[in-house]
Amino acid sequence: MKILFDVGNTHTTVALTENGKFFKIKRISTYSIQTEDELYAYLKVFFGETYDEVIVSSVVPNINHVFEFFSKKYAGKSAIFLNAQSYKGITWNVKIPSEIGADRVANIIAAERDYGKDAIVVDFGTAITIDILKEKSYEGGIIIPGFSMMINALFKGTAKLPKVELKPFNGFIGKDTESNIRIGIINTVVEGIGSVINKIKNENFRDVPVIFTGGQSKIIMDYKRDVIYDLELGLRGIYYFYESVVS
C-alpha cells in the first residue's frame, strides 16, 4: 500500500491507497509530527504496519526529514517528494517553478488529469490559494489569508473582539459580535473570490470548471453552489505525481 502525506501549515492529511482511486484518510495536526517513530506508532493504529511507498506533498520543509526517515525505516526506500520541476505533463509558466507550493502543484496536476486542460482551483487552507490552468499551462495564481488567519488577526489586533469558531451563518447582518465576525469573514471571502474568478474568466476563458478544495471549503458550501467541490483533489494529484515519476 502507498501512504500519502499532504502536509499543510496547520493540518496534515494522511491517506492510504492502492490505486489512487480510493483513500483511507486520517487528518492529524502538523505540529504533532516530531519523529518518524512517533508518527509510525500513531498511524499503525489506523492504517496497519506495512507500506511500500511514501509520497509527500509538503509546504513545511523543516519537518521533511521526518518523512524521509519514516520512509527509509518503514518502507525501505527514500520518500518521493512532490515538486513542479519533476512533473512534465504541465508547463509551469511562472518565474520560479520551484517556489510553487507542493499543495498547489498537486491540485493542478489532478485538475488537469480529471477536469481537462483548463481549470481554476481554489484551495481553502491556512491560506486561500487560487490557481489558473490554461491549455495545460500553469499560469500562476493568487494567495490571500485564510479563514483562521482572518479570525486570529481580529482577535490579536483588537482589545475586545473574541476569537470565534467559524461556521456557516445565514443572513447578511449580524445581531451580536460573534455573528458580525462570522458574516463579515464568510461574505468577504465568498464575494471576493467570486469577483476574482469572474475577472479571471473574462480575461482568459468563459467556460472553465471552477474547483473548490481544502478542508475549510466545507464552510462555504451553502454559499457558493456554482462550483465543483472536490475534497480529495490534492490527494489524487499526489498519487498522479507518483505515477508519473515511477513510470
Swiss-Prot record:
Cellular-component GO terms for this entry: cytoplasm
What is the enzyme's class at the highest EC level? Answer: transferase
User: InterPro entries, alphabetically?
Assistant: ATPase_NBD, Type_III_PanK
- Where is it localised? Cytoplasm
4Fe-4S as UniProt keyword: no
The EC code for this enzyme is 2.7.1.33
What detail does the entry give on cofactor binding?
A monovalent cation. Ammonium or potassium.
Cofactor(s) essential for the protein: NH4(+); K(+)
Question: Principal localization?
Answer: cytoplasm
Q: Self-association or partners: how does it assemble?
A: Homodimer.
Q: Which family does it belong to?
A: Belongs to the type III pantothenate kinase family.
Q: What is this protein called?
A: Type III pantothenate kinase
Q: Which organism is it from?
A: Thermosipho melanesiensis (strain DSM 12029 / CIP 104789 / BI429)
